[in-house]
Design a protein with these regions (language model features):
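Residue-level detector of the short coil/turn that links helix A to helix B
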Residues: 24, 58, 95, 107, ...
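Canonical tetratricopeptide repeat
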Residues: 15, 49, 85-86, 132, ...
Length: 231
């Protein structure tokens, strides 16, 4: 947006940025939001929009820095639980995008883990903090060699089980399936250890059968269960 002889306000730049964002021109939209914030740096809400735009443009460094700036500047609602949750998700996305560099990936994922841990501390009965800690750990340990996500998925299930209706709700039902699948596969990998074989087979069947109760048409798990009989 070229001002020419006109004088544009922060609101004008925000409006144009919104138009560009709807067109998925996130780089250009970000430039407009930056101008808006330069004109009115009392509007901390612009920082949140700007961070989201950077994230959509996969500029995670700026997205994280800007969201942290938003959290520090928002004196009214500073450091709400949801802020830590959203910042954790940005860090998680950054970690996933940085898998070519283990060091960088781990840095972002550990930062995400720290954010989700705050969510758990402030809202211990909200399963989402546990779930996203599980996911961050799973990305750090993709071959399940260390089972980093195992205790975290177990904690997720413990929290979900506090409300029996969670197995009926679509969103939490998917979380159950995700956790059962991971824990079943983790135990399946333990069947190669003779000392743990029988216990691991039983645990695998338990988790995967629980998964099938919620997702009976899952052919992948149905076939995987058949392989257990040949072990």
């Amino acid at each position: 947006m070229n001002p020419g002889n006109n004088v544009f306000t922060a609101r004008d730049y925000m409006t144009y940025g919104d138009i560009l964002s709807k067109q998925k021109k996130y780089g250009e939209a970000g430039a407009q939001y930056e101008k808006a914030y330069e004109l009115d740096n009392t509007r901390t809400d612009i920082l949140k929009v700007l961070s989201d735009t950077y994230e959509r443009n996969k500029d995670y460094v700026k997205a994280i820095d800007t969201y942290e700036k938003y959290m520090n500047a928002d004196t009214v609602n500073n450091q709400r639980v949801m802020d830590y949750y959203l910042l954790g998700q940005i860090c998680y996305s950054a970690g996933q995008a940085a898998q070519d560099s283990v060091e960088l990936m781990n840095m972002y994922l550990l930062k995400a883990d720290t954010m989700f841990q705050v969510v758990i501390e402030r809202s211990p009965m909200d399963y989402r903090g546990y779930l996203w800690r599980s996911r961050a750990a799973a990305v750090r340990d993709p071959e399940l060699k260390e089972g980093l996500a195992k205790p975290l998925y177990e904690e997720t299930l413990t929290v979900l089980d506090q409300d029996p209706s969670n197995k009926e709700k679509a969103a939490t039902k998917r979380v159950y399936i995700e956790a059962y699948k991971y824990l079943g596969y983790y135990n399946y990998l333990q069947t190669t250890n003779p000392a743990k074989k029988n216990e691991a087979i039983a645990a695998t069947k338990d988790y995967w059968n629980k998964m099938l109760e919620l997702d009976p048409g899952n052919t992948e798990i149905l076939e995987a269960l058949k392989t257990l009989d040949s072990l």
